[in-house]
Amino acid sequence: MHTKSGRSFLGGPEKYLVKRFTKYVPLETYHLTLLTLVWSALVLVAGYLAQKNIDWLWLTVAAIVLQYITDLFDGAVGRYRKTGLVKWGFYMDHYLDYVFLACFVASFGFLLPNIHMLALTVILAAGFMISTFLDFGATQEFSIYHFGFGPTEIRIVFIAATILVWWKGAVLLAQVLPWFNLFMAVLLVSLVYRTQKQLWKQDMRNR
């Protein structure tokens, strides 16, 4: 069994929601996990339809919120009912998180002409995931929170980006995206440097 480490800005309110409402969730843990496939498809459909009517981006916002809810409760439901699939859940939950991320970015590909910047966004996001899982393999501590940001905060960024495109159009996002990618690159380098430094110290203590 792995342990999670780190914290996010919204971790406290999330723990309250999980504790308060888990027993009312009507679906099983694996149903909640697999629903990410539905939300991913909705995001792609919304991006495609937004080419003709930008208001379809509100479907993207709804899909992000729904994916947040199902992702927040899938593990909690399994633990509460003692029906969790630990290994399957760990693999599918995190892999489908990446699928959702990729579909979200790909949906903007219908609206933005500069696909290279979007591809770089996916590469940088994958860099954070790779670092997380390599760190987990080395320490057995699973940290999905970096610099106070976790999945919830990232979803808020997704929603903000979607509303920005709906409000001001894709041109403004195209101007912001290079700076956003630069910011992500700086954070990724900082994360890798910090992680390798911590692992180095652990290795030196265990010599």
Label each region the model flagged.
Residues 59-106, 131-138, 193-194:
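Acidic (Asp/Glu-rich) catalytic motifs at the cytosolic membrane interface
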